[in-house]
Protein backbone atom coordinates (compact mmCIF):
# COMPACT_ATOMS: atom_id res chain seq x y z
CA UNK A 1 0.00 0.00 0.00
CA UNK A 2 1.25 3.45 -0.93
CA UNK A 3 -0.08 6.76 0.37
CA UNK A 4 -0.20 10.20 -1.14
CA UNK A 5 -0.31 13.19 1.18
CA UNK A 6 -2.23 16.40 0.53
CA UNK A 7 0.04 19.02 2.10
CA UNK A 8 -2.78 21.59 2.14
CA UNK A 9 -4.38 19.65 5.02
CA UNK A 10 -2.87 18.69 8.37
CA UNK A 11 -3.54 15.44 10.25
CA UNK A 12 -5.32 15.67 13.61
CA UNK A 13 -3.06 14.04 16.23
CA UNK A 14 -5.19 12.56 18.98
CA UNK A 15 -2.52 10.80 21.03
CA UNK A 16 1.25 10.38 21.02
CA UNK A 17 3.88 9.26 23.47
CA UNK A 18 7.15 7.46 24.02
CA UNK A 19 6.91 3.96 25.48
CA UNK A 20 9.53 1.77 27.13
CA UNK A 21 8.15 -1.74 27.51
CA UNK A 22 9.03 -4.25 30.22
CA UNK A 23 10.87 -7.45 29.33
CA UNK A 24 8.67 -10.12 27.73
CA UNK A 25 6.07 -7.54 26.62
CA UNK A 26 3.57 -8.39 23.88
CA UNK A 27 1.56 -5.63 22.19
CA UNK A 28 -2.16 -6.07 22.98
CA UNK A 29 -4.63 -7.01 20.26
CA UNK A 30 -6.73 -4.09 19.03
CA UNK A 31 -8.39 -2.50 16.04
CA UNK A 32 -7.92 1.26 15.88
CA UNK A 33 -10.23 3.75 14.22
CA UNK A 34 -7.19 5.95 13.50
CA UNK A 35 -3.89 5.76 11.66
CA UNK A 36 -0.96 4.80 13.90
CA UNK A 37 2.72 5.42 13.30
CA UNK A 38 5.20 3.38 15.38
CA UNK A 39 8.89 4.39 15.37
CA UNK A 40 11.20 1.91 17.13
CA UNK A 41 14.12 3.43 19.03
CA UNK A 42 15.68 0.31 20.57
CA UNK A 43 15.04 -3.40 21.00
CA UNK A 44 12.59 -5.31 18.82
CA UNK A 45 8.83 -5.16 18.33
CA UNK A 46 7.01 -8.17 16.88
CA UNK A 47 3.85 -6.72 15.37
CA UNK A 48 1.15 -8.26 13.22
CA UNK A 49 -1.38 -6.28 11.17
CA UNK A 50 -4.14 -8.55 9.88
CA UNK A 51 -2.16 -11.48 8.35
CA UNK A 52 1.17 -9.65 7.88
CA UNK A 53 3.89 -10.12 10.50
CA UNK A 54 6.69 -7.61 11.00
CA UNK A 55 9.87 -7.55 13.07
CA UNK A 56 10.73 -3.94 13.82
CA UNK A 57 14.19 -2.96 15.10
CA UNK A 58 15.85 0.33 16.05
CA UNK A 59 15.33 2.84 13.24
CA UNK A 60 12.34 0.98 11.74
CA UNK A 61 8.84 2.38 11.52
CA UNK A 62 5.44 1.07 10.50
CA UNK A 63 2.30 2.89 9.43
CA UNK A 64 -0.95 1.14 10.42
CA UNK A 65 -4.28 1.87 8.78
CA UNK A 66 -7.58 2.39 10.60
CA UNK A 67 -9.95 -0.54 10.79
CA UNK A 68 -7.23 -3.21 10.69
CA UNK A 69 -6.45 -5.49 13.62
CA UNK A 70 -2.92 -5.31 15.00
CA UNK A 71 -1.26 -7.23 17.84
CA UNK A 72 2.05 -8.55 19.08
CA UNK A 73 2.92 -12.13 18.24
CA UNK A 74 6.13 -12.66 20.24
CA UNK A 75 7.42 -11.31 23.54
CA UNK A 76 10.20 -8.72 23.42
CA UNK A 77 11.44 -5.52 24.99
CA UNK A 78 11.61 -2.23 23.10
CA UNK A 79 11.42 1.52 23.25
CA UNK A 80 9.28 3.32 20.68
CA UNK A 81 7.25 6.38 19.80
CA UNK A 82 3.64 6.08 18.73
CA UNK A 83 1.40 8.65 17.09
CA UNK A 84 -2.36 8.15 16.66
CA UNK A 85 -4.01 10.47 14.19
CA UNK A 86 -7.04 11.03 12.01
CA UNK A 87 -6.52 12.42 8.57
CA UNK A 88 -8.37 13.47 5.48
CA UNK A 89 -5.03 14.38 3.90
CA UNK A 90 -4.04 10.78 3.04
CA UNK A 91 -5.11 8.72 0.05
CA UNK A 92 -4.20 5.03 -0.08
CA UNK A 93 -3.20 3.29 -3.30
CA UNK A 94 -2.78 -0.43 -3.96
CA UNK A 95 0.51 -1.36 -5.59
CA UNK A 96 -1.19 -2.41 -8.84
CA UNK A 97 -2.64 1.13 -9.18
CA UNK A 98 0.77 2.85 -9.24
CA UNK A 99 1.33 2.62 -13.05
CA UNK A 100 -2.03 4.36 -13.59
CA UNK A 101 -1.13 7.11 -11.13
CA UNK A 102 2.22 7.71 -12.81
CA UNK A 103 0.60 8.47 -16.19
Q: What do these predicted ranges mean?
A:
Residues 12-100:
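N-terminal regulatory/effector-sensing and dimerization cores
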Amino acid sequence: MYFSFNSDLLPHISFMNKCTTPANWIHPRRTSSEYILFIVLSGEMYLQEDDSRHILKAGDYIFLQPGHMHCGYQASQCEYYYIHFQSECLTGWDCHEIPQIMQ
